[in-house]
């Protein structure tokens, strides 16, 4: 019996910030169901694919009933009766149906929900795990990066830099790495409390203490790593996501950073000094604005052989934009977010480009998440090497890490572990 798409149904659900988002069910003629929920970002690149929101008074304008209607109407009519096993064909059908460069007609949140759900339905129909359906048998568990201190637009902490992350550089297994991070996370909470600092958590589960500066945040991270005997930079390393678009003045072309107005050159010097003083810092994401390609390229030239420089807002998981970045030698790694581009097929294309160009890849969640663990399977299948999904708090974050634990258990003790640096 030929299996085809029988029904596609979308609904409006709520994400981890209490905002509406799209969830899609794809049902096949063999009775198989594939379900997927779409995440949403707070700090977004200007050239990301467009989330379709309703506007108006309902749900403060953030409703997604239009996107839901597009799934249940035009998209369903275009895809019903199609084989779920030709993902690229179906994704391109939706792209053509939308007819815009940024998916603003049907909505990237509508298209991505269907794209993800079809993949899951096809895997379920074949009775294999999603990561196997994506990636076959040659698989690798990614190195996780945990956001333990939140700043920027993700928390009311007063720190300009958005994320301070830790990663288990040395680990015997994914579970061993997770154990190390959990230990540090709880020790960090005690250290902050002992210093009289409050420990609320931000959107991504990290603590949001009033530490004042980036350097203070990095310095305090050394303490729980040291006290656990993990040696900063040896067993546990540190990374930051500046999300510098949030403090870049596009008109005046400078960065309003920690009470000062810095040029690109001055900000580069700041990062250089930070890396020299704190050698456990191995990765900087979006150190420069998406509108400051020259600054990003200068940092890559100066530091690209010594530290990972991740492009997020500057590339927005878009293969066309990323090709431009490769030509200009901007960054040496790329952050991968499914909803930035809006289909699974285009996301895979971007990852393939990165691999050919020698760029590292890091799969990422969004600040507005759901309990869908899709990116965990995706990171394993794509040999992404790295993943970040928030901290060790908030169930929508931890669920991705728990899914990676399950995958490790399924694959057995001999499964390969991605290693960075290395």
Swiss-Prot record:
Q: What is its main location?
A: cytoplasm
Q: Tell me the cofactors it needs.
A: Mg(2+)
Gene3D superfamilies, alphabetized: Enolase-like C-terminal domain (3.20.20.120), Enolase-like, N-terminal domain (3.30.390.10)
Location comes to: Cytoplasm; Secreted; Cell surface
Note on cofactor: Binds a second Mg(2+) ion via substrate during catalysis.
Q: Which UniProt keywords apply?
A: Cytoplasm, Glycolysis, Lyase, Magnesium, Metal-binding, Plasmid, Secreted
Q: What is its EC number?
A: 4.2.1.11
Query: One GO molecular-function annotation for this sequence?
Result: magnesium ion binding
Record SMART domains = Enolase_C, Enolase_N
Which GO CC annotations does the UniProt entry carry?
Answer: cell surface; extracellular region; peptidoglycan-based cell wall; phosphopyruvate hydratase complex
List the disulfide bonds in this chain: none
Query: Which EC class does it fall in?
Result: lyase
Q: Which GO terms describe its biological process?
A: glycolytic process
One Pfam family, please name it. Enolase_N
Q: Which residues form the active site?
A: 204, 337
Question: Does the UniProt entry include the keyword Hydrolase?
Answer: no
Binding sites annotated in the UniProt record for (2R)-2-phosphoglycerate: 162, 337, 366-367, 388
Cite the binding residues for Mg(2+).
Answer: 241, 285, 312
Give me the reactions it catalyses. Answer: (2R)-2-phosphoglycerate = phosphoenolpyruvate + H2O
Q: Which InterPro entries match?
A: Enolase, Enolase-like_C_sf, Enolase-like_N, Enolase_C, Enolase_CS, Enolase_N
Q: Main role?
A: Catalyzes the reversible conversion of 2-phosphoglycerate (2-PG) into phosphoenolpyruvate (PEP). It is essential for the degradation of carbohydrates via glycolysis.
The UniProt entry, under HAMAP family, shows: Enolase
Entry similarity comment: Belongs to the enolase family.
**Record protein name field:** Enolase
- Give the species: Streptococcus thermophilus
């Amino acid at each position: 019996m030929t299996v085809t798409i029988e029904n596609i149904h979308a609904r409006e659900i709520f994400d981890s910030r209490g905002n509406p988002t799209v969830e899609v069910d794809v049902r096949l003629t063999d009775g198989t169901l594939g379900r997927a929920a779409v995440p949403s970002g707070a700090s977004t690149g200007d050239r990301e694919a467009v989330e379709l929101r309703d506007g108006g008074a309902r749900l403060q304008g953030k409703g997604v009933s239009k996107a839901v209607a597009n799934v249940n109407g035009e998209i369903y009519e275009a895809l019903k009766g199609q084989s779920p096993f030709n993902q690229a064909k179906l994704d391109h059908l939706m792209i053509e149906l939308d007819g815009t460069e940024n998916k603003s007609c049907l909505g990237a949140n509508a298209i991505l929900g269907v794209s993800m759900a079809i993949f899951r339905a096809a895997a379920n129909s074949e009775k294999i795990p999603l990561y196997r359906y994506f990636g076959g048998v040659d698989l690798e568990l990614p190195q996780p990066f945990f956001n333990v201190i939140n700043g920027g637009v993700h928390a009311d902490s007063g720190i300009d830099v958005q994320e301070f992350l830790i990663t288990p550089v040395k680990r015997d297994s994914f579970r061993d790495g997770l154990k190390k991070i959990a230990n540090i996370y709880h020790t960090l909470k005690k250290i902050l409390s002992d210093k009289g600092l409050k420990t609320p958590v931000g959107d991504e589960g990290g603590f949001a203490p009033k530490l004042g500066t980036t350097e203070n945040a990095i310095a305090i991270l050394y303490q729980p790593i040291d006290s656990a005997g993990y040696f900063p930079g040896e067993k546990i390393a540190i990374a930051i996501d500046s999300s510098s678009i949030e403090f870049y003045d596009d008109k005046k072309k400078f960065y309003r950073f920690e009470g000062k107005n810095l040029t690109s050159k001055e900000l580069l010097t700041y990062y250089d000094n930070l890396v020299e003083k704190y050698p456990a810092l191995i990765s900087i994401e979006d150190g420069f604005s998406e509108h400051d390609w020259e600054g990003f390229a200068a940092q890559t030239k100066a530091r690209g052989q010594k530290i990972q420089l991740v492009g997020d807002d500057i590339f927005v998981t878009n293969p066309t934009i990323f090709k431009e970045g490769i030509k200009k030698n901007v960054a040496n790694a790329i952050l991968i977010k499914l909803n930035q581009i809006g289909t699974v097929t285009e996301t895979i294309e971007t990852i393939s480009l990165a691999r050919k160009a020698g760029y590292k890849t890091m799969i990422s969640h969004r600040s507005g998440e759901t309990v869908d663990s899709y990116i965990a399977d995706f990171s394993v299948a794509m040999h992404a090497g790295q993943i970040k999904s928030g901290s060790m708090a908030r169930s929508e974050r931890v669920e991705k890490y728990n899914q990676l634990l399950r995958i490790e258990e399924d694959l057995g003790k001999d499964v390969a572990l991605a290693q960075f640096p290395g």
